[in-house]
């Protein structure tokens, strides 16, 4: 009998608590807060679909400026700027290119591939030039600088230095420390 009474009291208390809880929930207000949305039209929308393909495009003006600056450091060196992105290819064969990032390639002929101190100092000089390019001349986000240290056609060291990583983590490094920070044989 005692158990039955405890069960009844438990059920009544639970039902009362549930009823009170439901009564204290606030109903949604009639004033809905809607955030302002800014719509920016970039191109006229066409219903035509396209196929996306990774693509590269040359950046002739940026290439000339960087190549000239690199040749001032070493007349045997060369540099090239490339835009990386996507081609949107339509069914009629036409296409549009969307830039994702700007990448660079810098080549330096060398006599000895063990001069890591000199290579690191070269990287520092080139990265200082690249990071001083006005941001409005860089399309998309920062990409990378690919360094080629070439002894001959078969003997070379090639690796990439992500520009933003250099700015964030390595701009104060030089010499062998900078070289080894990015070169992973």
Kindly give the residue locations of the regions a language model identified.
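Short, non-transmembrane amphipathic alpha-helical segments
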Residues: 116-138
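Protein-protein interaction modules outside structured cores
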Residues: 50-51
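Polar/charged, Gly/Pro-rich intrinsically disordered segments
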Residues: 24-26, 55-111, 135-185
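Residue-level signal for mature regions of secreted extracellular proteins and peptides
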Residues: 43-44, 81
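Ser/Thr/Pro/Gly-rich low-complexity linker/stalk segments immediately outside membranes or between
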Residues: 26-41
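Hydrophobic membrane-insertion alpha-helices, especially the h-region
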Residues: 10-21
């Amino acid at each position: 009998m005692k158990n039955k009474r405890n069960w009844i009291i438990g059920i009544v208390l639970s039902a009362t608590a549930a009823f009170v809880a439901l009564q204290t929930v606030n109903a949604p207000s009639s004033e809905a807060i809607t955030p302002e949305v800014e719509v920016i039209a970039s191109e006229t929308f066409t219903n035509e679909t396209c196929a996306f393909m990774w693509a590269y495009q040359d950046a002739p003006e940026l290439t000339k400026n960087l190549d000239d600056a690199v040749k001032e450091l070493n007349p045997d060196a060369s540099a090239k700027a490339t835009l990386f992105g996507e081609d949107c290819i339509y069914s009629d064969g036409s296409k549009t290119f969307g830039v994702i990032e700007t990448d660079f390639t810098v080549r330096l002929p060398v006599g000895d591939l063990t001069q890591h101190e000199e290579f690191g100092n070269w990287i520092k000089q080139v990265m200082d030039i690249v990071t001083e390019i006005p941001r409005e001349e860089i399309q998309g986000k920062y990409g990378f600088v690919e360094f080629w240290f070439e002894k001959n056609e078969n003997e070379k060291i090639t690796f990439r230095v992500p520009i933003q990583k250099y700015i964030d983590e390595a701009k104060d490094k030089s010499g062998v420390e900078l070289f080894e920070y990015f070169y992973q044989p």
